[in-house]
Each structure stands twice: as structure tokens, then as C-alpha cells.
Amino acid sequence: MLKVGIVGGTGYTGVELLRLLAQHPQVEVAVITSRSEAGVKVADMYPNLRGHYDGLAFSVPDSAVLGSCDVVFFATPHGVAHALAGELLAAGTRVIDLSADFRLQDAEEWARWYGQPHGAPELLPEAVYGLPEVNRERIRSARLIAVPGCYPTATQLGFLPLLESGLADNARLIADCKSGVSGAGRGAKVGSLFCEASESMMAYAVKGHRHLPEISQGLRRAAGGEVGLTFVPHLTPMIRGIHATLYASVADRSVDLQALYEKRYASEPFVDVMPAGSHPETRSVRGANVCRIAVHRPQGGDLVVVLSVIDNLVKGASGQAVQNMNILFGLDERLGLAHAALLP
């Protein structure tokens, strides 16, 4: 059994992590921390977890206790993992960070986007970007894993086959993405109130979203060079889900794009390339660690449209974190994650 610790268990990614790990046969959650909720039982805060964590209570973070775990997940705001990750790594504990702290390889770029100096730049060279469909082999031997963000996961998985094959015009990529309100976190915000978010949709951060440099970094790796990306996120009146509509110019009309995508993801347990002509729905991935993709070439022209959907809390966060843990410790990648999506 793997002894697991969780730092920051009171947000949506934290409770989703608890839900997924409760179904995992090789895991014992030994400690979960929250300074504000120390002493509160997990099952009292989250009634859906009654019968799974009845003896577990939130506690103040203690490096010695966390350092006794095989792996510690950080489900925290950015900046928190900077302070603790190095100490845990020195104790021999593996770290899987769901925040943005180690996703960008350039500390100065991270500081520009997150408005504060990077707190552990010395750890960036060894941080492995935890997108299994790209970095599976590096994940196996990692000490520190940076779990990708929700928008970056859906966008990169949608674009990868076109960029890796050299088919797309890398200078003119567009990602038009929609997110459920849970992507804004559990904290009280006016824009997340029911009366504000219901029956309305809006674009935001068009000038520049924090996920833009992360997406661009991944697409550059796939393309082997610079890319030009326009990324426009939207907030939609649903709780869970990311729907990415991706546009790329592909001049070669002789390529069988359906076959290209099917071949690229044939061995990937959590990427579903849907039949030609499909339109994946966010409800088809709700609660599941899967990305569903459909590729289109409207009117047979040069513009290719890729539709990519995920659950932002699962494949876009906690589910992908568990997938990384499974790979890291040599377990079946599907362990604890094989359940179907919820309908309706």
C-alpha cells in the first residue's frame, strides 16, 4: 500500500483527489492538511466521503509527518508547494503538484505571469511535466511531477498529432476554450455566484491568461520550434467541464486526419478519438479521467477544427494526478480511474 499525504484538501481538486483515492486499492491516505480546517473530520466537511475517511481529520502541515509518506499531493494555490517541496524531496518523498508552481521551466516567466518571484527555481530542472501522453517515460523516474492545468491538457491533447507530424501552420493556432465554474475554485467570488454565472457565458483574460505560457511551452515541444497561439478562455454556466475548439491551418488535404489521430492515441487508455463527424460533449466525460477528441476539416478546406473535451477536475487535475502516481510507482495506469463518466 502506498502511504499518501495531501496538502490542501479543502478545495475542489482536493476533494476530487480524495474521492478518486477512496476507490484506489493500493492507496492509504494517511494525512490531509488544512490550516483553516485543522481538527475537522474529512467526512464532516464532505458527506459524500462518509464511510471512506471516517477516521481522517484535517491537520496543520507538518513536514516530518508528510515526509513519512511515499508520495504527497499538493492541491494548493500557487506558491505553497515552493516552500515545502524541497524539504519533502530531501526526505525521499515523491511530490505530485496540482498547482502551477513547477509547470513552467522558466522561473522569470513564471514570476511575470503569477506576480511573485519563483520560490524554488533550483527544482525546476528536475520537475517533470505530468502529461502522460507525452512524458510517460520521464514520469516513471521522476521525484517531482507538475500536473498540467485543465485548459493546457485539453488544448495540448487536441493539437499534438498535428504539430508532431509537422502538418499544421504553427504560426496560426487558435484555442477557443470553455470552462465550467468549478475551474474558478471553491473560494467565494462574485463572478462565481449562481446569479452571476447562471444563464450567461463570457470570455475573460483575452489579453493573456496564466495558462497561455504553459500551453505554448507544450506546443513548442511538440512542434520542435516556435508557435503562434491565440488562446481565449470562456466561463460557461456548468459546474464541470472543458470544451476546447481548436483551429489550425493544414494545407495538405491528402492526409487522413482521422487515421492520424487514431494512430497517435491508439495505445492511450485515457484518450478517446471519436468516429469521424462526431461532436464530443462535456457531459460524456463528467467524473471520468478521459479526453474525448474529434477532428474535422469543414468543407474539405485548409482549416482543421479539433474538438477536445475533459472534466476539468479529473483529467484536468486530480484524475491526471492519480494517473501520474500510478505510472510513477509502476502500477496499472488505469487503477482507480477506470470508472465510466456520469450521465445524466
Curated annotation (Swiss-Prot):
Disulfide bonds: none annotated. It holds the Pfam family Semialdhyde_dh. The active site is at C150. InterPro entries: AGPR_AS, AGPR_type-1, NAD(P)-bd_dom_sf, NAGSA_dehydrogenase, Semialdehyde_DH_NAD-bd. SUPFAM superfamilies: Glyceraldehyde-3-phosphate dehydrogenase-like, C-terminal domain (SSF55347), NAD(P)-binding Rossmann-fold domains (SSF51735). Its EC number is 1.2.1.38. It is found in: Cytoplasm. It is an enzyme of class 1 (oxidoreductase). It catalyses: N-acetyl-L-glutamate 5-semialdehyde + phosphate + NADP(+) = N-acetyl-L-glutamyl 5-phosphate + NADPH + H(+). PROSITE patterns: ARGC. GO terms for cellular component: cytoplasm. GO terms for molecular function: N-acetyl-gamma-glutamyl-phosphate reductase activity; NAD binding; NADP+ binding. Keywords: Amino-acid biosynthesis, Arginine biosynthesis, Cytoplasm, NADP, Oxidoreductase. GO terms for biological process: L-arginine biosynthetic process. Pathway: Amino-acid biosynthesis; L-arginine biosynthesis; N(2)-acetyl-L-ornithine from L-glutamate: step 3/4. It comes from the Bacteria. Belongs to the NAGSA dehydrogenase family. Type 1 subfamily. Catalyzes the NADPH-dependent reduction of N-acetyl-5-glutamyl phosphate to yield N-acetyl-L-glutamate 5-semialdehyde. This is N-acetyl-gamma-glutamyl-phosphate reductase. It comes from Azotobacter vinelandii (strain DJ / ATCC BAA-1303). The gene is argC.
